[in-house]
């Protein structure tokens, strides 16, 4: 997409990777935020909700796999 900034692109990739952590790990939101490249968990939560439509904790509760 030509209208996407570098930051938007990298955030999208980070959020996609964070979905896997949320589904398959017991890591905290802070640990996941750090693992995917966000320095601030609240910023991660804001970006996640903006892109996915729900906060990461709710996403995890709805999509947890064993």
What are these regions (language model features)?
Residues 1-39, 61-66:
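Terminal helix-turn-helix DNA-binding modules in bacterial transcription factors
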Residues 40-42, 46:
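The DNA-contacting recognition helix of HTH DNA-binding domains
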Residues 46-66:
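…primarily DNA-binding HTH/wHTH and HhH modules…
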């Amino acid at each position: 997409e030509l209208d996407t900034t570098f930051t938007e692109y990298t955030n999208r990739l980070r959020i996609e990777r964070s979905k896997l952590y949320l589904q398959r790990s017991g890591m905290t939101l802070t640990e996941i935020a750090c693992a995917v490249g966000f320095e601030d968990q609240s910023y991660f939560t804001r970006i996640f909700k903006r892109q996915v439509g729900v906060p990461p904790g709710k996403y995890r509760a709805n999509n947890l796999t064993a």
